[in-house]
Structure formats: structure tokens, C-alpha cells
């Protein structure tokens, strides 16, 4: 399986420069996660791998509706031939609100994984975006493991129980480095409230115990505090470690601060100490 390290960094695909990738590698982050449904050709992945020496690159996630499995598999093999073991293929079903052809996502995921099998993409080199129990079980059975997004440590604990002890559990969590909670929540709102209209995320948040009132835009203080780690650097790291304590192997930081690199520099030594 691709070595991810304990902590990684999430940005939309195209969001990392080569210089930033090299600095994040030097700072000790283990993986660069490319979000926003990158196309099947996986542009930018090779550039980041070429610019660095050891850090891994992963997708979070390739959308099964828009990226044909055959083309994705070809991209995977091309990358793995040049940079063996350093790329993890994360895939997922996206959102019904965003996809005109949306069918039952579970069936489409199974078909997609079948195609990746036929194309020779190893189980241990792919992972699946998963929130609910059924897709979490599929992730454990058919891939290296699960990539939950917009979740709490309580979800992480339940996901680990479903996946068992051996499957990968790499969890995204948002970060704002600000000791003023009102200001931190305001910074977080644009990157949280979008998901409150998406029923798969809203349903998962309800499963985690949030009420309808919490999910009214822009989201309650209780919801924002649970989904976004904010405060001092020490407090933020402690909040991220709650996912590790709950069973995560890897925590993916999505930094919402205007100067995200400054935040990542500040957090890096504390994250290293926690490992």
C-alpha cells in the first residue's frame, strides 16, 4: 500500500505548486491530496511527484461519473511506472445534486471497481470515499480502505469498527488557526455551508447526532466547531489527534486560512511531536 504518513494536506486539484509540494515534503507531511474531481488524465499528479522525492500524492476523489475507469487505470499505470508506490487512487461517487446521470451510487461504484480490477489496478493502491456503513464495508472489501470527508471523531470511531483493524482510514478535517472562535467560524463558513445542501453529507451529519437546526445555513456554532479545528496551534493539533485516537491511520488537513502555508508551517513541528 502507498505510504501516506500520519498527516497530509488537501487542496483542490491544481492547488499545489511544485515549490509548495517540496516545502510540505520538507515539513514532514506525508501526502498531498488532490480534491475537486480531477479528470481521468490526472493532470498535475506527475508534476507533483516529479517535483518531490518521497511524499505521496493521492486523489480525493476521482469522480466515477465523470472519469472513465479505463482511462483512470491507464493514468494510474503510467504514474506507477514512473513513480512506483507513491500514488494512491482515491475514487468516489460525488453528489446526486451535481451529476445529471446520477443512478444508484453503490451499483456504479461496484461496476467501477470491477473495471479497475480488470485493468490491473491493485486493491491496495486504491481507496474509496465513504460515509455510510454500506460504502464503508465496500471500501474495506474492495480497496485499501476509506476516505471520509466532513466528519467528526465519532464518525471515525464508527468507521473503524466497520472497517476492522487492518483497512486504511484516512480522514479529512478542516483547520483554521485562530484563537477567536467567532472569527474562526466566519472563516470556515464558506467551506462548510456548501455541503449542507448535499443530502449525502446532511444525512451523515444527522446520523452523527446533529439536528435540522444545526444544518440550517450557515451551520450552527456547534456544527462548525465539530467540523473545523480552530484555536491555538496546540489546540488544533489536539483536535486533529482525536481522529487518530478514534482509529484513523491518517488525517488530512484542509487549511481554510488565507495563508495556508503559514498555518502548515506552524503546525508541522507540533504534528511531528504528536506522531
Kindly label every feature range from the protein language model.
Residues 1-275:
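Active-site-adjacent structural elements that line small-molecule/cofactor binding pockets in enzymes
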